């Protein structure tokens, strides 16, 4: 399958950390997950995954607890997850995932970033046939045989599995997030991160010069406070 699903996430998280942006984004993800599925982690696999991702970034427990409590607060009532489709030069397709309490502000910012950096926002749903919504889990490399893990997880909704260095990537349909998470936990495997992501059905390869051109747009999108993730069709 390849891991072209999200733009330079590891590099960007390191950069966010320096910019003190990683915690607010992780906190918002926790709040949204708690709002959508309830504040009890044991009953909410998305919340458990969001908490695991926050802990992996050394987010303090007090911050995590505050983000969960915020889901029941007045301010959380208006937080929504919104997706924007767009395109850049050289055939690059982009889906931007935002969590915002002010869609008017967010869409204005996203449109401005695209237009000022050689891109264009497309009508909602324009790229739905170019990407597939998937559950994606990142696990520490298990001590057991990978093929055994794969066979065990098929009944829980596994569609693909990929080992890269010390990280095992587990994929499933977006509707299988909860059951797949449950299967992973039953095997005693630790989830480092679990998210719903947009995976490109086909990818493109850019030259270094082309990538530098497109990166200006992608960097600006990633830096916006309301943007949670940026997905592209770049290999």
UniProtKB/Swiss-Prot annotation:
Subcellular location: Cytoplasm
GO biological process, one term: regulation of DNA-templated transcription
SUPFAM superfamilies to which the protein is assigned, alphabetical: YebC-like (SSF75625)
GO cellular component: cytosol
Classification via Gene3D superfamilies: 1.10.10.200, 3.30.70.980
Single GO MF annotation: DNA binding
Principal subcellular localisation of the protein: cytoplasm
Pfam families from the UniProt entry: TACO1_YebC_N, Transcrip_reg
Keywords (A to Z) from UniProt: Cytoplasm, DNA-binding, Transcription, Transcription regulation
InterPro entries associated with the record: Integrase-like_N, TACO1_YebC-like_2nd/3rd_dom, TACO1_YebC_N, Transcrip_reg_TACO1-like, Transcrip_reg_TACO1-like_dom3, YebC-like
PANTHER family recorded: TRANSCRIPTIONAL REGULATORY PROTEIN YEBC-RELATED, TRANSLATIONAL ACTIVATOR OF CYTOCHROME C OXIDASE 1
Sequence similarity: Belongs to the TACO1 family.
Name of the molecule in the record: Probable transcriptional regulatory protein Ccur92_05350
